[in-house]
Curated annotation (Swiss-Prot):
Source species: Shewanella frigidimarina (strain NCIMB 400)
Name of the protein in its database record: Translational regulator CsrA
Subunit structure: Homodimer; the beta-strands of each monomer intercalate to form a hydrophobic core, while the alpha-helices form wings that extend away from the core.
Superkingdom per UniProt: Bacteria
GO molecular function terms listed in the Swiss-Prot or TrEMBL record: mRNA 5'-UTR binding
Length: 65
């Protein structure tokens, strides 16, 4: 895993078309902004896992099934 340090307002690049910008830090929460082409899906991890479990027909942890 690559670990980077960024300050509020600073950006990192993923490939040529995806940028991640630190928008703010409040306590232990970090707000980030992601700019990516429409064909690139961007999800929080828990949402991505729910999507994957729904595709496979397996209930996700904490799901309402």
């Amino acid at each position: 895993m690559l670990i980077l340090t960024r300050r509020v307002g600073e950006t990192l690049m993923i490939g040529d078309e995806v940028t991640v910008t630190v928008l703010g830090v409040k306590g232990n929460q970090v707000r980030i902004g992601v700019n990516a082409p429409k064909e690139v899906s961007v999800h929080r991890e828990e949402i991505y896992q729910r999507i994957q479990s729904e595709k496979s027909g397996t209930p996700s942890e904490g799901g309402n099934y």
